[in-house]
Amino acid sequence: MTTLGGQVIAEESTLIPQLYAHEELLALLGAIAGLDAVPVRDPLERHVINVLHKPGDTHGAHTDDYPLALVLFVHALADPADGGLLEYASRAHHLSALRRSGTPRRAHRTPGDGYLLASDTTPHRVTPLRRVGLRRTVLNCAYTTPDRQQAVTPSAARLYRRDP
């Protein structure tokens, strides 16, 4: 998996940061989620790009630090049998729910698709790519509420920080 953190995206793109903080988008996300959606203060986690491009590439089971993730697909796999599927367990709160038979749901997406996920309370992962020549690229935008600006874990820093 190749990743780009928010600080790199902010340096290289004007469009993504503008879209991320657009007032109408924030209002729409807040209305859908029933929350006062606001941008995440941490530039590393605001928006990230994840690219799966090798056989076996996956995004392992996790929950996010912030309550909302807007995920937009740039590249997606045509055939669900090739992997790259979102697996999730709504309102499960524990990663173990993804291991229970019948619990995880799967979602196949195509380029241009997107979804809004209650990412702090929904364990989720991406299934491994199954062969050479595949690419799954997403822009993931994290949103929070005014009282939830502090990250709970250091995991994003491990994934997205720039090495010196």
Predicted features and spans:
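Flexible, active-site-adjacent loop/turn segments at secondary-structure boundaries
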Residues: 17, 50, 59, 124-127
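Surface-exposed loop/turn and secondary-structure junction residues enriched for glycine/proline
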Residues: 12, 19-22, 52-55, 64, ...
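Short N-terminal helix-initiation segments at or just after the protein's N-terminus
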Residues: 6-19, 56-61, 79-90, 142-151
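Short, hydrophobic/aromatic alpha-helical segments in well-folded domains
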Residues: 15, 25-28, 73, 111, ...
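Signature of the catalytic double-stranded beta-helix
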Residues: 1-45
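Catalytic core of non-heme Fe(II) oxygenases with the double-stranded beta-helix
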Residues: 30-45, 50-116, 120
